[in-house]
Structures are given as structure tokens and as C-alpha cells.
């Protein structure tokens, strides 16, 4: 039975797990988490790619190869390279395919083949099994006709050749298989077949002989024997996969085989197009297409995918949908993650052609310092050569990519973006832009030279003019600083002895951690560090002046008539 009085109460919740925990006080920020790692995770649809797990990419090319088309590869292109000059975005992005992709399969010739590519693309793969170049072996071919990708493996099954080079007139080899597992290799030699004696015995259950490579090396070390590999691809195959052999002549070169094991091993290790599972007796078959691959449908709820993110370290979440229900799920996830010591920010957007009033309505439903609503829809050169509008959730992805491409304390206000046009004419100075900004909508605008820029990097929080709650960069900096202090204290002190010098040691660690943030220009300064040690608890309070963006430059230009008080001479 759980005892609910264990642990401590802090910041409105009960803490049982030992560690360093924190809260952020923003009460002193009027007009005046965890720590960000600049790693976004994006949830959306794709033509291919395995659903139900986080896939990681460092560039858009690999993503397009694996995901095909759809929202995800399009968004990744914009997240990796949001700036007009190229680049300027995320360096690593996690992806979750929301639609339930299904790989194509085919079961034939005693083998089940499954496309490595999830989705309809696997239906374009054909497989074939025929006799190999070495008698008794097989040759496997997989071909994808639209990309002309080819996997081909010859001499499958023939893993090693063995020959007896001694003076005996007869030499044979046995491979003993017990319950489907090869357990022993034994050679016998003699003057005739009726008078053979055991010459060598290898216990394959001994780790010394656990692979084909190890067996071959041992045989080559023994006089009167020679062995060679058929292909280096099979060197690491377990010797326990060898097929049974009884009395096979080795006076001339003979082959040890492992047809089932070698087929599964080589294809699983080296094939790009398919995976295999041997289901019965392996026999040849002609070219056969895989079938049943589907893009799949997208569920109405993405809660299962959000649960996957709880096991990842990420500070930026993008959901590629205009569904307000999914936006609400994602925001609830982000709020929950703050209590799990993984502070995150959510970036979302609406659909195509939405009016400003609709965007304002969406922002009001979120109203959080951890949620960013982007507007309007956009035209990007990579999507139908810039001739078709992308929904505003792509705008959110692009802004998230830029946020991931700069330090946490760097504002993204007035950053320019690599776009052809906007889905709605938003010109600098339009009154509706002011209305959007004051309503918590992160808005793009077009300036005189045709460039497109972000008006202000803001969250959907609508309340006091508190930059920690309103500004993306200040919110992320607070997360970074708070988590850095908490993590450093946890790593340094939790589980250690509390002694007379503990308070001063904690003060020093906090001071050193904050001083580093001053050096990196994440904060302006810090002070008032207070540490209290009571029983098993250490209470730490401190104050930090965070770096805030310069949003307004107010210039008074005074023009007066010339009455002789000004000099006209060059200095």
C-alpha cells in the first residue's frame, strides 16, 4: 500500500522521486522547462515511414527518401532551412508519422518478405529466389521499379568451404543439429570408409566457435585443414545456424551451409528494400510483387503519439494539423511535461485562407506562454514551385525551425523567412497586424523590398505585458536557466551527505551556474541567492534579470527653421 505522506509538497504538487525541482517566479517581470536543447519533434502525415516511433533526421534529403511525400517532409525542408540565405534552422529534428502506415508483404517459397518502406511504395517491390552460383546455394533479388533500387545476394547458404589436406585417404565432416540448433562439428579420417576415427571436434556451444569466422579461423590454424569464407557478409553469422551434415566428403573442397540462417542474416543486415522471416521449407520462386502496403489513416486523437514524446528529450513540439482538438491535446501534453522536468513549447497553426478573426479565435483558445500560433498560410518555392498555398501550420513549423536555429535568448522578431508570398496580404503597417499581435498571434508580414519577416516572436498568452509570458525568447531563456540550475544541483548534491558546508556549497554551485549564463549572454545578472537546509530538503531561491528583446526604438526627429544657429561647415 502506498504511503501518501512520503515526499514533500512544493509548487502545488507532491514530490516523491528524489531530485532537484523548480518553479519560475514571473511576478517581477511586468513591463519592466527542461532546459532548451533546440531539438524539435514534429507530428504529421507522410506517404511512407514507420508510424508509432520517433524517427530522427539531420537533413531533408534522408527524410524525403524515407518519408516520401506529405506534410512531414515538406515541413522538414522549411525547418532545416527557414532563412532566405539558406540554413538558419534546426540541426536535428524528430518526426512521428501520424497516419497508420502499413508495409507491403509477400509470403512465398517458405519465406515472408516485408517491405522496409512503410506505405504504398512497398507495393512496387518485387522479389525472386533462384539457384545460386555455388551448387546448393540460392540467389536472392529484390527490385523496386520506380526508383530502380536493387538488392541482390548470391550464394546464400554456402557460408564456408572446408578441405582436408592430410594423408588419409578418406575424410568426412558432420554437423550435428539438436532441436534446430547446430551444436557440434566433427571430422573423421581413415584409410577407408569402414575404418574412420574422429580427428577434430568443435563444440559450437563454446563461445570460442560462436561465429562462422571463428570456426574458419580455427580450422585454418590446424594442420591438414584449410577453410575459406564464401563472402565476408556471412562472417558474423552464428555457427549455431549451420545446417545438419552427415559424412560429407572433404578430401576436396566442400561447403558448409546455413540456408535459413544466412538468408535471414544477410538480408536483415545488408538489404535496403525488404526484411525476411523464414516460415517453411525454402524453395525457388519467380518475380513476385509485394502487396498490401498502405498509407493508412490518421486517427482523430494524437494522444498516443504525444505519449511517445514523453520518452524523448525535446523542447519544441510542432503538430502539423489545423485541428483544434489536437492542438488542445498537444497543449495539455506540454503543460504536463513541465511537471516532468521537460519544459517544452508548442508551435501550431490553422488552415489555408483563414481570416485574421479566425486566427485570433484560435489563439484565445490556447492562451499559454508555452503555445505559439502562427499566421497566415504561406507560399514556399518547394511546394508546387510556390504556386499553391500551404496551411498556417507550415508557418508554425518554419518559425519553430528558426527558433531551434538560434540560442534560447536570441529573439526571432524581424527575422526574415525563405518564402515566395503569404496566403493573405499582410503589409507592414496594416492595422490588422497590430490586432493580431495584441491577440497573441505570431504573424508574418511583407515589407517594402518584398521580404517576408516575423513581426514579433510572441506566444498566445493574453494578459499582462509580461515578457516572460509573451516573448518566445524570454520564455525559453527562463526555461534554460531554471533547468540548468536544477540539473546542476541534482547532479552535484542529490544522494550525497548533508554536512555543515552544504549550504555554502549549494550557494557556490548556483552562483557559478548563473555566472556562466551571464557569460553566454542568456541573462544580464543575478543575485539574492538564498539557501536553506532542513532535514532532507534544500530550499534554493535566487533572482535573475533575463535578456529581453529590443522591440521598440522610439525616435523624436525635431525639424526647425534655420536661424543661423547651425553650422554648415564640414567637420
Curated annotation (Swiss-Prot):
It is found in: Virion; Host cytoplasm. The keyword Transcription regulation does not apply. Polymerizes as an extended structure around the baseplate-tail tube complex. During ejection, the sheath shifts to a contracted form, thereby making the inner tail tube protrude through the host cell envelope. Keywords: Host cytoplasm, Viral contractile tail ejection system, Viral genome ejection through host cell envelope, Viral penetration into host cytoplasm, Viral tail protein, Viral tail sheath protein, Virion, Virus entry into host cell. This is Tail sheath protein. One of its GO terms (cellular component) is host cell cytoplasm. InterPro entries: Phage_sheath_subtilisin (IPR035089), Tail_sheath_C (IPR020287). Its main location: virion. One of its GO terms (biological process) is symbiont genome ejection through host cell envelope, contractile tail mechanism. Homomultimer. The gene is 9.1. Belongs to the myoviridae tail sheath protein family. Pfam families: Phage_sheath_1, Phage_sheath_1C. It comes from Bacillus phage SP01. Signal peptide: none annotated. The keyword Transit peptide does not apply.
Amino acid at each position: 500500500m502506498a504511503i501518501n505522506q512520503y515526499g514533500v509538497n512544493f509548487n502545488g504538487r507532491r514530490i516523491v522521486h528524489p531530485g532537484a525541482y523548480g518553479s519560475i517566479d514571473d511576478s517581477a517581470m511586468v513591463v519592466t522547462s527542461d532546459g532548451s536543447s533546440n531539438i524539435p519533434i514534429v507530428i504529421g502525415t507522410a506517404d511512407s515511414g514507420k508510424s508509432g516511433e520517433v524517427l530522427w533526421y539531420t537533413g531533408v534529403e534522408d527524410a524525403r527518401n524515407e518519408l516520401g511525400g506529405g506534410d512531414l517532409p515538406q515541413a522538414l525542408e522549411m525547418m532545416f532551412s527557414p532563412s532566405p540565405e539558406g540554413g538558419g534552422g534546426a540541426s536535428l529534428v524528430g518526426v512521428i508519422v501520424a497516419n497508420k502506415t502499413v508495409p507491403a508483404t509477400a509470403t512465398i517459397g517458405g519465406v515472408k518478405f516485408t517491405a522496409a518502406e512503410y506505405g504504398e511504395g512497398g507495393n512496387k517491390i518485387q522479389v525472386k529466389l533462384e539457384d545460386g552460383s555455388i551448387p546448393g546455394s540460392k540467389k536472392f533479388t529484390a527490385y523496386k521499379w520506380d526508383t530502380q533500387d536493387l538488392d541482390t545476394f548470391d550464394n546464400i547458404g554456402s557460408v564456408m568451404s572446408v578441405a582436408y589436406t592430410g594423408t588419409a585417404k578418406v575424410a568426412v565432416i558432420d554437423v550435428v543439429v539438436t532441436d534446430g540448433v547446430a551444436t557440434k562439428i566433427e571430422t573423421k579420417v581413415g584409410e577407408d570408409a569402414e575404418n574412420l576415427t574422429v580427428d577434430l571436434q568443435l563444440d559450437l556451444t563454446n563461445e570460442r566457435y560462436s561465429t562462422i569466422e571463428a570456426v574458419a579461423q580455427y580450422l585454418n590454424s590446424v594442420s591438414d585443414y584449410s577453410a575459406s569464407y564464401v563472402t565476408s557478409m556471412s562472417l558474423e553469422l552464428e555457427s549455431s545456424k549451420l545446417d545438419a551434415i552427415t559424412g560429407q566428403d572433404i578430401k576436396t573442397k566442400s561447403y558448409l551451409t546455413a540456408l535459413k540462417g544466412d538468408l535471414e542474416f544477410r538480408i536483415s543486415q545488408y538489404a535496403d528494400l525488404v526484411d525476411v522471416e523464414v516460415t517453411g521449407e525454402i524453395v525457388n520462386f519467380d518475380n513476385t510483387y509485394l502487396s498490401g502496403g498502405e498509407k493508412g489513416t490518421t486517427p482523430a486523437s494524437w494522444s498516443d503519439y504525444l505519449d511517445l514524446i514523453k520518452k524523448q528529450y525535446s523542447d519544441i513540439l510542432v503538430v502539423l494539423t489545423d485541428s483544434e482538438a489536437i492542438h488542445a491535446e498537444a497543449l495539455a501534453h506540454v503543460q504536463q511535461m513541465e511537471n516532468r522536468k521537460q519544459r517544452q513549447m508548442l508551435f501550431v497553426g490553422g488552415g489555408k485562407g483563414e481570416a485574421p478573426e479566425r486566427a485570433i479565435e484560435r489563439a484565445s483558445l490556447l492562451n499559454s506562454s508555452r503555445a505559439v500560433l502562427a499566421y497566415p498560410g504561406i507560399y514556399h518555392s518547394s511546394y508546387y514551385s510556390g504556386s499553391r498555398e500551404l496551411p498556417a501550420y507550415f508557418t508554425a513549423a518554419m518559425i519553430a525551425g528558426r527558433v531551434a536555429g538560434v540560442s534560447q535568448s536570441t529573439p526571432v522578431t524581424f527575422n526574415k523567412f525563405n518564402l515566395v508570398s503569404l496566403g493573405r496580404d499582410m503589409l507592414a503597417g496594416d492595422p490588422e497586424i497590430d490586432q493580431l499581435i495584441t491577440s497573441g498571434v505570431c504573424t508574418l508580414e511583407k515589407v517594402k523590398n518584398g521580404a517576408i519577416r516575423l513581426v514579433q516572436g510572441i506566444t498566445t498568452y493574453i494578459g499582462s505585458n509580461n515578457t516572460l509570458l509573451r516573448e518566445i525568447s524570454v520564455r525559453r531563456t527562463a526555461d534554460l536557466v531554471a533547468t540548468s540550475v536544477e540539473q546542476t544541483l541534482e547532479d552535484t548534491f542529490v544522494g550525497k551527505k548533508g554536512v555543515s558546508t552544504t549550504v555554502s556549497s549549494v550557494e557556490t554551485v548556483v552562483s557559478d551556474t548563473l555566472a556562466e549564463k551571464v557569460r553566454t549572454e542568456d541573462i544580464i545578472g543575478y543575485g539574492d541567492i538564498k539557501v536553506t537546509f532542513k532535514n532532507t530538503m534544500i530550499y534554493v531561491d535566487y533572482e535573475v534579470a533575463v535578456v529581453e528583446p529590443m522591440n521598440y526604438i522610439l525616435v523624436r526627429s525635431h525639424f526647425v527653421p534655420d536661424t543661423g544657429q547651425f553650422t554648415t561647415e564640414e567637420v
